[in-house]
Amino acid sequence: MSSSDDLDEDELLQMALKEQSQRDVTYQKPPSANSRKPVTNLVQQPRRQKRAAAPPSKGGAKASRKPSMDEDDESEVELLSISSGDEDEGNDRGRGGGGDGGGGRGRGGSGKERGRARKEDDRAWDGVEPDCWKRVNEAELARKVRDMRESRTAPSVTQNLDRKVSGADKKVVLTSLQSFPRGMECIDPLKLGIIDNKTLRLITESSESLSKAEKVDNALREKLVYTSDHFDPKLFISRIHQETSAADLESGALALKSDLKGRNLQRKQLVKDNFDCFVSCKTTIDDIESKLKRIEDDPDGSGTTHLFNCMKSVTSRANRAFEPLFERQAQAEKIRSVQGMLQRFRTLFNLPSIIRSSISKGEYDLAVREYKKAKSIALPSHVNLLKRVLEEVEKVMQEFKGTLYRSMEDPKIDFTSLENTVRLLLELEPESDPVWHYLNVQNHRIHGMLEKCTFDHEARMEILRNQVHERALSDAKWRQIQQNGVQLSDDTSSMEDNQVQVDQPLEESARREKDALRGRYIKILTAVIVYHLPTFWKTALSVFTGKFAKSSQVNDTSASKAEEKAEEARYSSHSLEEIAGMIRNTISVYEAKVQSTFHDFDESYILHPYMSDTIKEVSKACQAFEAKESAPHSAVMALRKVKVEITKIYIQRLCSWMRASTEEISKEETWIPVSILERNRSPYSISYLPLAFRSIIVSGMEQINMMILSLKGEAARSEDMFAHIEEILISVRLAFLNCFLDFAAHLEQIGADLSQRTTKRESWQNGYSNDHQEEQSINAPESVVDPHRQLLMILSNIGYCKDELASELYNKYKYTWLQSRRNDEDISDLQDLMMSFSGLGEKVLEHYTFAKANLIRTAATNYLLDSGIQWGAAPPVKGIRDAAVELLHTLVAVHAEVFAGAKPLLDKILGTLVEGLIDTFLSLLDENRSDDLSSIDANGFCQLMLELEYFETILKPYLTVDATESLKSLQGAVLEKAIESISETVENNPGGHQRKPTRGSEDAISDDKQSSVSPDDLLALAQQCTSGMLQLELEKTRLNSACFIETIPLDPVPPVAKAAYSRTSTDSPSRNYRESQPMGSPVQARPRRR
């Protein structure tokens, strides 16, 4: 067919399609077979139906040739798989005379010829030979054909087949040959059975099922048919005789060789028997060939030129006469061709509208089935219109695929719909894996949601900043209005351009709101991954465990194994590890956002629940991921790592906050003592500073302890967390100890600053300063303003931390970090704390005792030098002087001050001060040996010894061993100075000039005694004065000394008191000193200790 014919045919097809679109798209079957003239399928495959062994009757033959309704439907389906070629149909009609018994010739002629043929058939039949097909006895004809075939078959075939039927597993015998219409080609050339012409396999017991399922293409058939030029013996043996034994194959080969040999002999015998015929035929052929050569040599033979010209003239006239008829005939042939093509491919032309209708109705399976039917049609290569129809179908299906892909992007799609969508896409053979497309879409959607959370958070933070700025601007304007009255200056507009100072309360409120927004942001991020990632992972598990793979398998028996392998490879091109990588990437994005936001939390509000609530949210996410089939193990470990990291940051911030808060409260000492109930009946009169420090440590350590317990629970489930937790525990322990050391250092600094200020005040008298009124106006009314009492308060704070607070808090929180530490290390930490506070206490105590020692030195100086007495000409002893009582009052004031401020340190402080007092007496005696204390007479010696015995008796509870030794040295120095003074007086008055006594003889020492005095006499005289006056003086001053001697009774001089005093006198340092001194030896004073 030429190109112009193709164009005309396309135009006719377009016109037919236009008419077809106006009809009903649903095809209705005609009511009867005679109402239409279907196009006969001339290339139909043989029907697979069993025929009876007996010859069929005439009526049966006719009935078998009549098409049924089912066969008509099958023919219509088979019509869709053949091509349209007029030339092939013409050739088929030409060859149809043998197969259809003249039916093809009847269809090829015109109506008049068919009518004439029917009239001739109705004529009388002579009964000898049938002159038309209807008079042919088809049964007899079939019998004759069968006999001819059997007569042409080698006689040994039947015998060999009959001989091999003895076993139960042998091939089908030759007697079943009559059910095959083709004859010799169905017999195995090896004479081992019969070959099925459809499947080209040897007929066995299971050949019935194989013939229905297996189809052989033409290329394979050409190689298996042994009469073909492309016959392949190896393929023939491997396919047809794949289950034949070797022995049978050998016997078959022998039979084949013998048959070939027999046929060669028969052919030679045939030539020999008909040699005359062969010679005659050869002569005839040579004659014909010579005549043809003569005709070719002389084409203008006798009369041929004239005949040729006449025929040419007739042909030209006929062409001019019948040209319109020929054109119409050609057009009619084209119309019939187009009509046949439309009839054949009517389903194809209706496919676009059918598929669109099915898709619009939601009948997706029907649309896919119709599309697959269209794909299976074998179209002629020269018909462009059919290709355009298929392109339209492809366009519709591409739109349908896009719709299915978009449906998978719906976040609310349920699992059933997803599975159905994936199944449809797999049946449509998409370019990419739809399951992987869905997983990628979901992964990008989760990332998009995380980014949207970040965008919303930044927007909320910006709104908050604008609100704070507007509030600050409004406050600034209001302050300007209050300052300038109702008049508004031009500075209001410039105020908006410049940076507005934000008030501290407003700034703190804004920081709290920012932390709240950060906590909300992390909570939303966590909710996104908790809600979506487990579902995403479960979907991936269902995909890679085969749930979608099963739905993607199409039950098409005609699909080749190569296509199945290709589909399997395409489906398995991705692994579950790639999905786990997607989830890990999502967790990494989440981790970066959480850690960045967690670092932005304000440390000032660390005790607020923002940071701890964030850690709890991450812990909930870990628990959700640890559920069955909720997330891959790597994602769980990554999320646990996020939790450990932010917990570590939180704990580090808590530790730094405790140290920073300790430093901050140390700068704000209020010097207000707490009540005994607030300090839990502690003997230390502490300020609020240790309690504030305790509150800071408890608040921080409680949060840390809660976080550590959570981390230990994580470590129990994962060994990888032990190293991180061990590092955190070490940092917590060091931070706890450093907080105490920092607090001790701050207390030491406060004490040093306070001592430095006290040394600059020269106007202090008995521990009071003249400028206290200024400090009272600054501090609270109940606060301590005296520097010495403040030093005592620092000492109490140190003692409270050392004796109570450190051990209490350490024993309470040591189990937080005691995961792998030994008990001796635990004890060493606490001992180090005690030693630190002890050393600090010694330093502050030195500041206090130094300040008090200055006061005591002043009082001692007033007592010994400025009391208005001349020790070289002292009056007689009448009792304890007022100067001694004033000196004792200084110690009483210190006792009261220490008892109220640091009672546990009372013995230590007074022991130090008493020892310092005695050393002060020694230093004053040594310093003024040549001045005010250049001489001491007997009365002065007795007075000093009485008062020293008085001091010793009262201060005995606070006399240390060193103080006792110092007192002995002091008494010896006084005795030595008295003896020296008396000796010098005697030497200066050799004439025996005697001073008249001004008082009674009992009160004065005679000149004879003074001139011949000895150390024992002086000690005896002093002991006499002491025994007569000491107890009386103790009674007089018992109220003054009650704080030192609490055992002194109120009754006047009871026997018990006397006995106590006698014991005291006996054990006094003066008596010991006297007993230890040799008679007449000079007294050497012990050097000063300080």
UniProtKB/Swiss-Prot annotation:
Which residues are modified to Phosphoserine? Answer: 179
Q: Where is the composition biased (Gly residues)?
A: 96-109
Look up the coiled coil feature and give its residue ranges.
none
Q: Which domain of life is it from?
A: Eukaryota
Keyword set, alphabetical order: Exocytosis, Phosphoprotein, Transport
Checking SUPFAM superfamilies in the record gives: Cullin repeat-like (SSF74788)
Bias (Acidic residues): 1-12
Transferase listed as a keyword: no
Keyword Transport annotated: yes
> Which GO BP terms, alphabetically?
acceptance of pollen; exocytosis; Golgi to plasma membrane transport
What does the record note as the disruption phenotype of the gene behind this chain?
No visible phenotype under normal growth conditions, but the double mutant sec5a-1 and sec5b-1 is male gametophytic lethal due to defect in pollen germination and pollen tube growth.
The annotated region (Disordered) lies at: 1-126, 486-511, 984-1013, 1055-1090
Which regions are flagged for Polar residues bias?
23-46, 486-502, 1062-1071
Q: Where is the composition biased (Low complexity)?
A: 52-62
The record's comment on protein family reads:
Belongs to the SEC5 family.
Q: How does it assemble?
A: The exocyst complex is composed of SEC3, SEC5, SEC6, SEC8, SEC10, EXO70A1 and EXO84B.
Protein name, per record: Exocyst complex component SEC5B
Q: Which organism is it from?
A: Arabidopsis thaliana
Give the gene name.
SEC5B
